[in-house]
Amino acid sequence: MHVVVSGAGIVGASCALELVRDGHRVTILEPATPGGRQSASYGHGCWISPASVVPMSMPGLWRQVPGYLFDPQGPLVIRWGHLPRLAPWLFRFMMAGATVGRVERTAAALASILADSPGRHQALSSEVGCGELIRQDGLLYAYPDRPAFEAEALSWRLRRMTGLTWRELDRAGLEAREPGLSDVYRFGVLVEEGAYCRDPGRYVSAIVAHAVALGARLVPARATGFAFDGSRLAAVETDGGPIPCDRAVIASGIRSKALAVAAGDPVPLEAERGYHAVMEDGSAGPLHPVMPSDGRMANTPTADGLRLSGQVELASIDAPPNWRRADILVDHARKTYPGLPGGSEAVRDRWMGHRPSTPDGLPVIGPASRSSDIVHAFGHGHVGFASGPITGRIVADLVAGASPLRDVTPFAAGRFAFGRV
């Protein structure tokens, strides 16, 4: 079969590679450079964590939303001008985390695509010739004290429920692992099975290049819709003309929303904008990835320097970046690691990108309503990078008509059908 994959981020690249491995003729549509700055995969926080099963929306969050609207320094901000359009999504977002039962179901679904993510990335990176980019050195969550950790009891209970294990560190343990960490932090949780990527852009580029070497074709075009012959897919429409095909995969990140509508599924997908800053001299920073509890940010040593990633900004996809969000990350990092250099010249790069996010925190994976010849693979939010390889395998199974490696029922687009919350 001829399969057209729309998008060459980590999810699209993984889908294309699995499909070409299975013997399909594969065309990858990507208007920009695979692994380039336009992709959420490029600027992602680099973590590959089985601990990322905790949804953004949790019980009691609704009480905090008004505060987010007025706190310019907080980890989550909503642009006022976007609020009217965002309101339906925001309502569903709060309802998704309204009860413990709901977040337990979400965590279980996320665990199904995250549990073995470090091993999958190690195998994939080795296959595509850049195994040195994936390191499984553990991921550290740093807290001021044990009570601060215990205040997140539900989050850690969800992680324990999904099979995660960790090791607790006191101040001496923190100092041994991270000598540069401020003495404000006196308690830590080390997820030893966690991994990270030292250069996400190069990694994604290598996956696409490997797929092309195996026979896939990379076309610099953007998918704009579909042509059908009855219930069957006839072609993918692009800004360069139609491409006849038998199957199609929607993996275009935030741009997937319009394609999903064309495939019969009006999915509530919003741009959850994230930022990162890179400090070239991170020698006084973390030796391994660290997430300080008060900053809600990933501090990760990478090939380019110390990457400081985080922030959630809900705004229009076309709104200009607010670089103050990146500056907040730098300011916090300098408090977390007092030895980091000061001054604007210490920051070598700033980036903003769009996490494609659904209100319930789960991706959309599975056949489209208009035609089962189209398979959705988008909306992964914060877990797209970690779950990219397994999503690719699931999609290849669905295209082949085989039983998928994981149950895709929780990820079906139909969960957003009219009348469902």
Annotated model-derived regions:
Residues 169-178, 219-234:
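A conserved short coil-to-beta-strand element within the FAD-binding core of flavoproteins
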Residues 166, 294, 335-421:
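C-terminal catalytic lobe of FAD-dependent flavoproteins
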Residues 2-28:
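N-terminal Rossmann-like FAD-binding beta1-loop-alpha1 element of flavoenzymes
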Residues 21-42:
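Glycine-rich FAD pyrophosphate-binding loop
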